[in-house]
UniProtKB/Swiss-Prot annotation:
Gene3D superfamilies: YVTN repeat-like/Quinoprotein amine dehydrogenase (2.130.10.10). The lineage of its organism: Eukaryota, Viridiplantae, Streptophyta, Embryophyta, Tracheophyta. The gene is CDC20-4. Its main location: cytoplasm. This is Cell division cycle 20.4, cofactor of APC complex. PANTHER family: CELL DIVISION CYCLE 20 CDC20 FIZZY -RELATED, FI02843P.
């Protein structure tokens, strides 16, 4: 290297090795844990570049300087010869209600197989009948041909309640009182028998309300509502001898579904005329031509599936038969249809969960399945298969967890579909009318 080159390549003095003295026998060793190599790399490679579009006003420079102070404190040196500053005290976010996210509820396990299968020989495959009911005393009643059987879910024992004479039968409908002690039995000859299931004795026969078979029954305390093939709906006060107190006229074909609301203020009926009616007892005895509160004609097939919502008193779910296959939701205050969901098959029965916002539907051809829906999104949570024929009947246990389903394949299946019961489960209703039939002197 010539002398000219040496003149232009002077070595900075602070890079030359320092002479050691007797008083300074060691070097300063930087604390590597306090180094900021990322910032150093940026400063060496990008720090000197300038953006040609950068605003160079005084306020902009002041802002950038202040931002650098806030974001990059004590970064004037690349090598740090001191320890890191102490970390900030940890903040307990549990003291602030706005910081705590709600705990995520674990996804509930839904068994895909039935817990138990019972034979039900002679079960009639008729869409217009109602042959299964689970009482509040935890006894399941099922009608097989001319005979009504009782299955005690607590003990597992089965007993025969009654076999109807051939000239009166077969049995076309059954329904428990709210206390689970008495059972109404509708017959093909238009009569309704009332049975005390504690003593296994018949206490009364209701006649004169219908001209043909009684396929639907629904209790509201001492009022037994009956629906017949003649299209009539009759309210019977079982405490008095002349039991018929109101008659509703509106259906032109057989009444195949009846349900009282939880409050007992409204009653829903569905028929083979594809019509759903909402009835109010105050209108039944009026002289007006129209007795119903609302009339829904949107279904295109028979409506048997009816279910009042347990958490919203005015909400009613209905399901259409073959050719319709829709579940519809109604506001029974206004008469508005809130939603309509296509299921793809005949809707035979509907049940609400007592503890969750869920709805269970049973179906016919092609899959003959039970479908669990999340309300109000109506997204499918599970499909339960096992039946080989349309699932006409469903009944819910008193604690709300177990569902019994009966189909034309003559099988009765038990499903743990609704999970564990709520912490405050409802106790079996006490009998409001312990002397319900005390004023009746004759059984027939």
């Amino acid at each position: 290297m010539d002398s000219g080159m040496r003149a232009t390549c002077t070595v900075p003095e602070h890079f030359l090795p320092r002479k050691l003295s007797k008083q300074n026998l060691d070097r300063f060793i930087p604390n590597r844990s306090a180094k900021d190599f990322d910032f150093a790399n940026y400063a060496l490679t990008q720090g000197s570049k300038r953006n040609l579009d950068e605003v160079t006003s005084a306020s902009r420079k002041a802002y950038m300087t202040q931002l650098a102070v806030v974001m990059n404190q004590n970064r004037t040196r690349i090598l740090a010869f001191r320890n890191k500053p102490k970390s900030l005290l940890s903040t307990n976010h549990s003291d602030s209600p706005h910081q705590n996210p709600k705990p995520v509820k674990p996804r509930r396990y839904i068994p895909q197989n039935s817990e138990r299968v019972l034979d039900a020989p002679g079960l009639r495959d008729d869409f217009s009948l109602n042959l299964l009911d689970w009482g509040s005393a935890n006894v399941l009643a099922i009608a097989l041909g001319d005979t009504v059987y009782l299955w005690d879910a607590s003990s597992g024992s089965t007993s025969e309640l009654v076999t109807i004479d051939e000239d009166k039968g077969p049995v076309t409908s059954i329904n428990w009182t709210q206390d689970g002690l008495d059972l109404a039995v509708g017959l093909d000859n238009s009569e309704v028998q009332l049975w005390d299931c504690v003593s296994n004795r018949q206490v009364r026969t209701l006649r004169g309300g219908h001209e043909s078979r009684v396929g639907s029954l629904a209790w509201d305390n001492h009022i037994l509502t009956t629906g017949g093939m003649d299209g009539k709906i009759v309210n019977n006060d079982v405490r008095i001898r002349s039991s018929i107190v109101e008659t509703y006229l509106g259906h032109t074909e057989e009444v195949c579904g009846l349900k009282w609301s939880e409050s007992g203020n409204k009653q829903a009926s569905g028929g083979n005329d594809n019509v759903v009616h909402i009835w109010d007892r105050s209108l039944a005895s009026s002289k007006q031509t129209r007795q119903w509160l609302h009339r829904f004609e949107e279904h295109t097939a028979a409506v048997r599936a009816l279910a009042w919502c347990p958490f919203q008193a005015s909400l009613l779910a209905t399901g259409g038969g073959v050719g319709d296959g829709k579940i519809k939701f109604w506001n029974t205050h206004t008469g508005a249809c809130l939603n309509s969901v296509e299921t793809g098959s005949q809707v035979c029965s509907l049940l609400w969960s007592q503890s969750e916002r869920e709805l269970l539907s049973s179906h016919g051809f092609t899959q003959n399945q039970l479908t669990l829906w999340k309300y109000p999104s109506m997204s499918k949570m599970a499909e339960l298969n096992g039946h080989t024929s349309r699932v006409l009947f469903m009944a819910q246990s008193p604690n709300g967890c177990t569902v019994a389903s009966a189909a034309g394949d003559e099988n009765l299946r038990l499903w743990n579909v609704f999970g564990e019961p709520p912490k405050t489960t409802k106790k079996a209703a006490s009998k409001k009318y312990p002397e319900l039939f005390s004023h009746v002197n004759s059984l027939r």
